[in-house]
Amino acid sequence: MSWRNNLRDVEPYVAGEQPKMSNLIKLNTNENPYEPGEKVKEAIQSFDPFKLRLYPDADASKLKHLIAEYHGLEDDQVFLGNGSDEVLALTFLTCFNGQNPILFPDITYSFYPVYCELFNIDYKTVALDDAFKIKKEDYFNKNGGIIFPNPNAPTGELMSVDDIEDIIKHNSESVVVIDEAYIDFGGETVIPLLKKYDNLLVIHTFSKFRSLAGSRLGVALGNKELVSHLYDVKNSFNSYPIDALAQVIGEASIQDSEVIKEHAKKIIATRERTKKALKEMGFTMTDSYSNFIFIHHDDYDAEYIFKELRKKHIIVRYFNAPRINQYLRVTIGNDEEMDAFLDAVKEIIQAS
């Protein structure tokens, strides 16, 4: 059969497990434990299904305007896609086709190398330091583009805006993409830097902070020319990526922002309480600024804890990968879920 040779060897991204078991505490895919705001629920209830017979607004104009207004930008600085994964894929295809390899951390979002293999993009992974932090100087070398999450995933470590700005300054001929999927759980966004740098692109998602993982809404924010090129590529694939109901839900979510910020505060408080309890059990962890924690115990195998938790219907994320195969990534759920998680971990340790 004749098809593109590079596609034969692509190893697709493996998404977090979505188990169907009952009485499940699901702490493996960084979903928000709280419901979307009331305006989202009202928007869904009042949506006229007769509208689904028509194609949606291809530009998602109202949603785009609300997002731009929320971030203090112009409408034509906003790119919308069907989830941030689609936005990232189109970003790789649009921005990372130079002669030099692109750079991203060795421990990061595992979709990045998949995009590179899929689109035949040369890349080089840059090792995090022993504390799983990004060293800005490692990104001052010649490259065809740079991308990393901030906070990073799965470590949760946060890089300062000043350090990111240094990277942007040293790479004026490359596009620097900052994936801010988790920025609203304690970090500082680099969006204000868009006023100073044309080579910066910022990726956001409605999945985490806004509790809309099931609706699939992703955003890229950048200078007008860069965003225009993203739309050129997107429209060569699909002119209608945001369905009509998702647009209405997204609009309502922006209007619900103050309520959602209170949910984020709850998650942060629960995260810090959980970290304290785990430290008392002998766990160590990274300085997570996200809605998850990345934990390790010197005396207990991570995969063993992962499997024992599963027996108790608690699902966390285990990565069988170099440097991190003795760590677990644990999504921060609500207080009841995290109490059950802590009790289960204590039982596992005491029984070992």
Where are these regions (language model features)?
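N-terminal "arm"/small-domain region of PLP-dependent enzymes with the aminotransferase-like
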Residues: 1-54, 142
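Phosphate-binding glycine-rich loop
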Residues: 52, 61-101
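PLP-dependent enzyme catalytic core of the Aspartate aminotransferase-like
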Residues: 162, 308-312, 317, 321-352
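Conserved PLP-binding catalytic core of the aspartate aminotransferase-like
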Residues: 268, 280-312, 328
